[in-house]
Amino acid sequence: MVVQLKTARLLLQIVDAFIEVWGAGRVGVHLAPRGDSHDMGDADPLATFGYVVEQLDQRNVAFIFTREYEAEDSLQPKLRPKFKGAWIANEKLTPESAKRILATEQADAVAFGLAYIANTDLFERLENDLPLNQVQFDTLYGPSAEGYTDYPVFEQLEA
């Protein structure tokens, strides 16, 4: 418990400061429970993030946005019941995994990052079970509009 307290201290102090200014209903927190980016990690992510989620629930923040891909060892199914507010899932979601996460109530909403970059008509594609454009990874974070504004919408593909 002491480790979780120390690990979460800065985040919770920031959340408390935001709540003081804007109120809990206008504060949300973005979490990456796996903590696996850039060689980061945690000895016990379930304990650490379980504590954080419980603390955020006690503070009545508006939402938690999680970045965690779906896998056998996903923490989201264990963390979600600890929070009464809105839960938004994100990270390498497919249309099928997004629907499954929503159907099993692991999240109240889902978000797409890369899929949206490649499919500006993403909502229509998901709603109508249309195929998705593939992301052109070699164009991401480049200096030009290529790979951001030149993906075809579905009607253009049919023409």
Where are the regions a protein language model picked out?
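Flavin-dependent oxidoreductase catalytic cores
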Residues: M1-A159
